[in-house]
Amino acid sequence: MSLYKKLNVRVECADGFSMSVQARETLYCTPRVNNAPSYSEVEVGFPSAPEELLMDYCEEPQNPTETVYAYVPVQVVTNVIAKHGGMVEGDVPPGVAPLKASRR
């Protein structure tokens, strides 16, 4: 078994917005461990467009689509996913609600 956790597949939302949502011992998350049963804060990275709900956590506000967002509360990530219509693909760490896009 590998000491390193595989990266989650990038989250893509119903409206086309996408972002990386990760948590492991080397990233900006709480707790900073691999394979926690649940995380309270996660690292978001490289969103496809600036997202106001994430800006308080942005490492480089002058370039919001080319940076990471540190210690983002899981409820904020869940709110971003909901705002963009839910997930159509991708993975989120335990603790983030994996809100799926509704089928019509």
Predicted features, each with a name:
Residues 2-37:
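Amphipathic, interaction-prone secondary-structure segments
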Residues 32-55:
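Short secondary-structure subsegments characteristic of cysteine-rich extracellular domains
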Residues 11, 21, 44-46, 77, ...:
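Generic structural hydrophobic/aromatic packing signal, biased to beta-strands
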Residues 51-104:
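Low-complexity intrinsically disordered segments
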Residues 4, 28, 39, 57, ...:
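Sequence-level detector for tyrosine residue identity
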